[in-house]
Amino acid sequence: MTTKGILGKKVGMTQVFTEAGELIPVTVIDTTPNVVLQLKTVENDGYSSVQLGFDDKRQVLSNKPEQGHVAKANTNPKRFIHEIRNVELGDVKVGDTIAADIFEAGEIVDVTGTTKGHGFQGVIKKDGQRRGPMAHGSRYHRRPGSLGAVINRVFPGKKLPGRMGNKTVTIQHLEIVKADTENNVLLVKGNVPGAKKSYLVVKSTVKNTK
């Protein structure tokens, strides 16, 4: 199955009316034209993909390897670089640009982003566990519960206090409401992971759309 995708930046959320008068929430994604930085093929790399670059970085903020990587594409160093796998390469070559017009209204996509970070949190906020009795005699309010008396170790993945958020998350099966080619903007129905100005990857959905 071939895939198409583009990199973007989350602008925020708004709402639009459909022709039937239905009000739907949408996320605005800035998809300033991406630059093709590298092409990978099955013969050379073992898989096929297109490496895209998004959001220019000033030369003074980039090092020599970053400048050399984009030299063949004749563009500025990029802040966000990502590969889209299983792409039908066709006539695509290094230095080409990919814009929002690769998608159309009604298409179904998967959006990947980095969730908001919330720092070190307890199990009530982080995992939704219940608190203990709040009476005066109780000494157990918001702490984690007992880990048990038999097993002498903690299993990996046990829900305990720790860092919350700042993880890569993919929201699947979102509908594109509008692809604004003039302003290089995609309107996606619903919400997507991450804070405003965070980077996103928009790809064709991997699941059956029936």
From Swiss-Prot:
SUPFAM superfamilies: Translation proteins
Gene Ontology molecular functions: rRNA binding; structural constituent of ribosome
Lineage: Bacteria, Bacillati, Bacillota, Bacilli, Lactobacillales
Subunit-level organization: Part of the 50S ribosomal subunit. Forms a cluster with proteins L14 and L19.
Family membership: Belongs to the universal ribosomal protein uL3 family.
Keyword Transit peptide part of the UniProt annotation: no
UniProt entry tagged with the keyword Zinc: no
Function: One of the primary rRNA binding proteins, it binds directly near the 3'-end of the 23S rRNA, where it nucleates assembly of the 50S subunit.
A Pfam family hit: Ribosomal_L3
Originating species: Pediococcus pentosaceus (strain ATCC 25745 / CCUG 21536 / LMG 10740 / 183-1w)
Biological process terms in GO annotation: translation
The protein's name: Large ribosomal subunit protein uL3
HAMAP family in UniProt: Ribosomal_uL3_B (MF_01325_B)
Keywords linked to the UniProt accession: Ribonucleoprotein, Ribosomal protein, RNA-binding, rRNA-binding
Gene Ontology cellular component list: cytosolic large ribosomal subunit
Lineage top rank: taxon: Bacteria
